[in-house]
Amino acid sequence: MKKRITYSLLALLAVVAFAFTDSSKAKAAEALPLYYLQITGITSDGNDFAWDNLTSSQTKAPNVLKGNKLYVKARFMGYTKLTVITGKDGKNLLYNGTAKMFKSDAILGQNKVVIGWDKYFEIPMDALQDNSIQIKALSSGTTFVYSQKIDFERE
């Protein structure tokens, strides 16, 4: 008899818990392919990591960059399959481990659905082709989306 009452109470508890579950807290949606990519910040290890914010129309870093490591913040809107930062040898610095993504922050849209990412990259300046940086990312199929190219002066 005790077992029957225990099972009945557990079943009732499960029904009540299910009935009061708020399904609006977590939403899943099909990810949009990458449609926007912008470099939004730049700094270096010799600049005490003081970020210069960049707009989409800027093509030059406002301050001279010092040190050996370049730090870039980029905004990715939509889902990306592959990110490319090209080095002197024409190869992807992220793939070969020369550069690395060290942080990412989700960008939330309506109903707390992730719609993009702010990603932070560390790149050795000597590995770049010249004193400039541009990021490209694979959106869907074979379509690449490009950020603006940012030139910088180096001390």
Curated annotation (Swiss-Prot):
Which keywords describe this protein according to UniProt? Signal
What InterPro entries does the database record attribute to this sequence?
A: DUF4879
Presence of the UniProt keyword Ribonucleoprotein in the record: no
Q: Which domain of life is it from?
A: Bacteria
In the UniProt record, the signal sequence range is 1-28
Quote the protein name from its UniProt record: SPbeta prophage-derived uncharacterized protein YolA
Q: What is the lineage of its organism?
A: Bacteria, Bacillati, Bacillota, Bacilli, Bacillales
